Structures are given as C-alpha cells and as structure tokens.
Amino acid sequence: MRECISVHVGQAGVQIGNACWELFCLEHGIQADGTFDAQASKINDDDSFTTFFSETGNGKHVPRAVMIDLEPTVVDEVRAGTYRQLFHPEQLITGKEDAANNYARGHYTVGKESIDLVLDRIRKLTDACSGLQGFLIFHSFGGGTGSGFTSLLMERLSLDYGKKSKLEFAIYPAPQVSTAVVEPYNSILTTHTTLEHSDCAFMVDNEAIYDICRRNLDIERPTYTNLNRLISQIVSSITASLRFDGALNVDLTEFQTNLVPYPRIHFPLVTYAPIISAEKAYHEQLSVAEITSSCFEPNSQMVKCDPRHGKYMACCMLYRGDVVPKDVNVAIAAIKTKRTIQFVDWCPTGFKVGINYQPPTVVPGGDLAKVQRAVCMLSNTTAIAEAWARLDHKFDLMYAKRAFVHWYVGEGMEEGEFSEAREDLAALEKDYEEVGTDSFEEENEGEEF
C-alpha cells in the first residue's frame, strides 16, 4: 500500500484538518467513531482508502494523521468534538504555551521542547505503514507555530525520511485581511527554511477564499468553517486519486514529476470548479467543458494573482465524478485554442489529466451544492510570483525600520537570518522571472558580447 501521513500544525492546520477528516469520513462511509456505516458499506469496494486510514483489530478506522499545536485550545476542540473517538489520543499533541505569532518561538524556543515527542508519534505512524509514500503537511505561513514549528519539523523529517515526498498545504497571508502584523516576517522565514525540504507546496490565500464564499456561495460574512470546508474539498480532490481507484490515477510523486520543472519552482496554483451554492446548482447544467473553462478564470483561484499575465509551465487537471476522457479532450482542446492562456515555449503540451469516478461528496448542511462532476486544476504558473512580490514588499517596509525584530532576536534568532531569508526569496522571484522568459531570446543575447 502507498500510505500518506497527514501532519496538521498550528491553529490553521488543525482546523483545516478537522474539515478534511470530516469530509474523508463521509466519502468513505466511516462514522465519527471510526466504524463503517452499514448503509455506506457499498462505497468501499476497493481498499484504496487505507492509504489514509489504518484499520485496528476491532474494525475501527483511524486516520493516519497527527495534529500538533503549541497551545492546547484548538486541539482541545478536537478532543471534545464530534470526531473525538476517531483519533488516537496520542495523535493529538499540544504544548503548554503558544508560539505567540513568533516564528522564532515556534522554531527555536518553544518548538524545540515538543519536536522529539512529535517525531516519536510520527515514527509510530510510519511503523504501521507497509510502503510509506510521503507526508502531507497542513499549516499557515503567518502564525508562529504554523511557520516556525513546521519548518523545524520539515528539517527533521528530511533527516529521518530523506527520500519520502513532502507536500505542503499552506495558508498564505491574504493581501488585505491580516490576522497578525508580523505575518510577512513569519512567511518569509518559513519559506526560506522549508524551500529545500518541501517537494510541492499548494498555497491557499484566505482572501481569495473569502471572495469565493461571498461571490459564488452568497455567504455575506464567511467564517473559518466556511473557508475550511471549501479548502477541504480541494484537498479531497487532490488526494482522491490516492484514496479511490480511478481510470487515470495520480500518485503523490506523479504530481511532482508533472508539476515541478525545477526543484525551487514548486508552488502550483490551485483552482477548483464548480463552486456553487445549492440554489444556483438547481438551475445550471455544469458540463465538463464549462467547469474546465471556469478553472482558467482568476476568480476560481485559491491565490490572488493573475495567470493571464503569467505563463503556464505545467497543468494538472483532476476530474472526479461523471467524466469521460472524450469530454475532457474536447474541453482541453477548446482551452488550447484560446489565446489568453500562454504556455512557456519550452513546455508546449503541458496538460496532465486524472479522472476519478467517485463524485464529490458534500458535508450535510454545508454551503456547496452536491454536483455530479468537479475538477481541480493544479497549474504551475509564473503568475504566482506576484504573491511573493507582495509579501516581500511588506517585509521590506517593516524590516527597513527593524520593526518587531527584537521579539525574534530575543528568542535566540540572529538578525542575519532575516536578510538571508529575504535574499533567498528575492532569488525565488528571480527564478520565476527567468523561467518565464522565452528561450530564443536568451540565445540572441549571447551574441552581443
């Protein structure tokens, strides 16, 4: 079996984890106490779901996951929530004091106390796997635990499980809405530290998701629950091919092979369609062609940036539900004829397709409509560099005045780490710029000298 272990770090990671496991349980017909739902037993003809759940002797299914936070309140909600019997108590790990939005606390002082315990618990999970495929790590860039502790954990996972792939689902600080003033610092420090350890990072921007909730789902004031349920649909689509059998299945390593042209350029843009409320879905027929073309609309994206200004390097379309390859080919051919979508000239074809026959499941009482088919597009585009540029700019404004830096230095960090991280991100922006330039232009430049 090809097992995946999910690691949920910090408040964002744990709350997204709640939404994801709730959805996974519904999709696989597993009840809140981990037993099979008698009515839903027909869903699980295949046992692919064991990539995400392990089965105990008495027929209980336990998620292969750990939830970690340096302060207890968020994980306590899981311990007392509907799914408290689903998780093994040792899978829920909490510290006593939080990282206080401070990368240095998560990475150096407070994080150091918990890291060995966490790795020990992860080791127990990996020992129960017959063929571990890799780790999915959920966290935010802006928080102290999400940024600091995650980067520490990634470094240690690289040491212990060198060749196993590590995919991140990261919550990127929104351009307008901010939960902490020091988000730019934390984000840049964590990106710098995890850049060499992460194989692929799917970024999700809260503001983009707020907008989707307002615009497509008619929720006036979206809560984190609304956001997380939408994010969990995306995570479910990306991991569906690992949990169900399908016509064109996609493996974790296959994502990287098809999406990451250079090791550092591993931040695909995620788009999901159809995102539609139940009232609207009742009156619309969402064909394969329609959902495919709406994937290329900037307002279905999970990060605010404009791919019409960038170039695509690779594109992965993951369909689920009532979809046949013929429709997909027609839809993609139609996309290719549109001139708005530019591919880099060194990667002419660039579409990888996965089809999974399990239709999307929705959480009862949730916001999304039950639809017959859905698509999740992962595209590696140079436009995502806009997101880095925005963050870097905010970082520069604060760092020029050395604002808030003493909090980091006070926790044992050196000031040099800030400039080192900033230079690394400047290099990342440059990498994106160079990847997007046409190869024939470079050949001409060489002749002038």
UniProtKB/Swiss-Prot annotation:
Record PROSITE patterns: TUBULIN (PS00227)
Look up the record and name the cofactor or cofactors this protein needs. Answer: Mg(2+)
UniProt main location, coarse: cytoplasm
Reaction(s) catalysed (UniProt annotation): GTP + H2O = GDP + phosphate + H(+)
Q: Name one GO biological process term.
A: microtubule cytoskeleton organization
One GO cellular component term of this record is: microtubule cytoskeleton
For this chain, the Swiss-Prot or TrEMBL PTM comment says:
Some glutamate residues at the C-terminus are polyglutamylated, resulting in polyglutamate chains on the gamma-carboxyl group. Polyglutamylation plays a key role in microtubule severing by spastin (SPAST). SPAST preferentially recognizes and acts on microtubules decorated with short polyglutamate tails: severing activity by SPAST increases as the number of glutamates per tubulin rises from one to eight, but decreases beyond this glutamylation threshold. Glutamylation is also involved in cilia motility. Some glutamate residues at the C-terminus are monoglycylated but not polyglycylated due to the absence of functional TTLL10 in human. Monoglycylation is mainly limited to tubulin incorporated into cilia and flagella axonemes, which is required for their stability and maintenance. Flagella glycylation controls sperm motility. Both polyglutamylation and monoglycylation can coexist on the same protein on adjacent residues, and lowering glycylation levels increases polyglutamylation, and reciprocally.
Give the active-site positions: E254
Enumerate the InterPro entries for this protein. Answer: Alpha_tubulin, Tub_FtsZ_C, Tubulin, Tubulin/FtsZ-like_C, Tubulin/FtsZ_2-layer-sand-dom, Tubulin/FtsZ_GTPase_sf, Tubulin_C, Tubulin_CS
What are the alphabetically sorted keywords of the record?
Answer: Cytoplasm, Cytoskeleton, GTP-binding, Hydrolase, Magnesium, Metal-binding, Microtubule, Nucleotide-binding
Entry binding sites for GTP: Q11, E71, S140, G144, T145, T179, N206, N228
Q: What is the residue range of the motif MREC motif? A: 1-4
Q: Does the UniProt entry include the keyword Disulfide bond?
A: no
Q: Which GO terms describe its molecular function?
A: GTP binding; hydrolase activity; metal ion binding; structural constituent of cytoskeleton
Other comment: This tubulin does not have a C-terminal tyrosine; however, its C-terminal phenylalanine residue can be cleaved.
Quote the PANTHER family the UniProt record gives. TUBULIN (PTHR11588)
Entry's family note: Belongs to the tubulin family.
The annotated subunit structure for this chain is: Dimer of alpha and beta chains. A typical microtubule is a hollow water-filled tube with an outer diameter of 25 nm and an inner diameter of 15 nM. Alpha-beta heterodimers associate head-to-tail to form protofilaments running lengthwise along the microtubule wall with the beta-tubulin subunit facing the microtubule plus end conferring a structural polarity. Microtubules usually have 13 protofilaments but different protofilament numbers can be found in some organisms and specialized cells.
Which disease is noted in the annotation?
A: Macrothrombocytopenia, isolated, 2, autosomal dominant: A congenital blood disorder characterized by increased platelet size and decreased number of circulating platelets. Affected individuals usually are asymptomatic and do not have increased bleeding episodes.
Q: What is this protein called?
A: Tubulin alpha-8 chain
